[in-house]
Amino acid sequence: MTNEEPLPKKVRLNESDFKVLPREDLLQRWKQYEAYVQALENKYTDLNSNDVTGLRESEEKLKQQQQESARRENILVMRLATKEQEMQECTNQIQHLKQVQQPSVAQLRATMVDPAINLFFIKMKAELEQTKDKLEQAQNELSAWKFTPDSQTGKKLMAKCRMLIQENQELGRQLSQGRIAQLEAELALQKKYSEELKSSQDELNDFIIQLDEEVEGMQSTILVLQQQLKDSRQQLSQFQQQIQISGNRTPSSEPKDEGETSGKDCGRILNGPSNGGSSLQRTHSSAGLYREGSSTEDDFSASPINEGKLSNHSQERTSRDGSSYINPLSTGYESVDSPTGSENSLTHQSNDTDSNHDSQEEKPVSGKGNRTVSSRHLQNGLDSSVNVQGSVL
């Protein structure tokens, strides 16, 4: 039976039970009693066995502890012996030092007889007398300065001391206040300087923003002008090709009529009803020039060199006329886009460069003879008609 199993109940039988109970009940109770006794015996044996093992273990532990304590005792005895030895050595050293420090009579006599030590003692005695004299003099002066409350010198001296103390306090206040005022002034200057720096920084920022806006406007106008210039050059090249083809194939009367009609339309669009006469003059002049050009067309048909000169001169005139028609557009865009007049300088520079290029390109053409003159008249008539058509577009 283990410790976890419960013990059976104890059976109690009286003499009356033996007399009254039947045999079967008595046997049953006897069996229960036997089981109870058996359980007790088992428990007793278990306890005995556990006690024996526990005693053995405790005995072993006690033996180990005894051995450990014996070892410690030996160690402590050894330490005690070493300590006693050290103590004996220390006592010996102390006695030796005492003997050394206690001079003998012979040593004392030798030190007193030594002249150097005697001189040292004499000097010490003289210094002691001087200090005593100084102390006595200081005490006499202190007693002399002592005065009664009724003495006039004491009152004057105290008043003077109070006045000096007040003056010192006032001087300290003035110095501190002057320093504070100086610091406040410096602080105000620094604040003013910082405000000026901030205002200048704000102005610079505004100026930079304005410059950025102007640059953006200039870039936009430049892009528009470049696009217009590109478109105008393309249109002029197309018109030049068409005019060359029509000049080679059609008679001189048809270009005259076309020039007149296009000149009339251009005059109506550009000048309005009031400038009709000027538009008619332009058409007549362009027609006359075109007639002169048609008369000289047969002369230049055989030579490829003259054709190259004619094309070069036509390119010069088209670039010149294209720039003359682009300038009004650029001025219109400048008046709308740019907040300032900074773009006007750009357009004037472009006009100056165009005029310089025209003058440089006209120099080699001016010395070519009568054929170049007639080709120039022809090209003037063609350019006038092309300009009229471009203005209509």
Curated annotation (Swiss-Prot):
The protein, known as: Pre-mRNA-splicing regulator WTAP
Pfam families reported in the protein's UniProt record: Wtap (PF17098)
Keyword Transmembrane helix part of the UniProt annotation: no
Stated family: Belongs to the fl(2)d family.
Annotated Basic and acidic residues bias: 254-267, 354-365
Region described as Disordered: spans on this chain: 242-393
Function: Associated component of the WMM complex, a complex that mediates N6-methyladenosine (m6A) methylation of RNAs, a modification that plays a role in the efficiency of mRNA splicing and RNA processing.
Subunit composition and interactions: Component of the WMM complex, a N6-methyltransferase complex composed of a catalytic subcomplex, named MAC, and of an associated subcomplex, named MACOM. Component of the MACOM subcomplex.
Alphabetical UniProt keywords: Cell cycle, Developmental protein, mRNA processing, mRNA splicing, Nucleus
Signal peptide positions on this chain: none
Start-end of Polar residues biased regions: 272-286, 321-353, 369-393
Domain of life, source organism: Eukaryota
GO BP term, pick one: RNA splicing
Main location: nucleus
Xref: PANTHER family: PRE-MRNA-SPLICING REGULATOR WTAP (PTHR15217:SF0), WILMS' TUMOR 1-ASSOCIATING PROTEIN (PTHR15217)
One GO location term (cellular component): nucleus
Compartments in which it is found: Nucleus speckle; Nucleus, Nucleoplasm
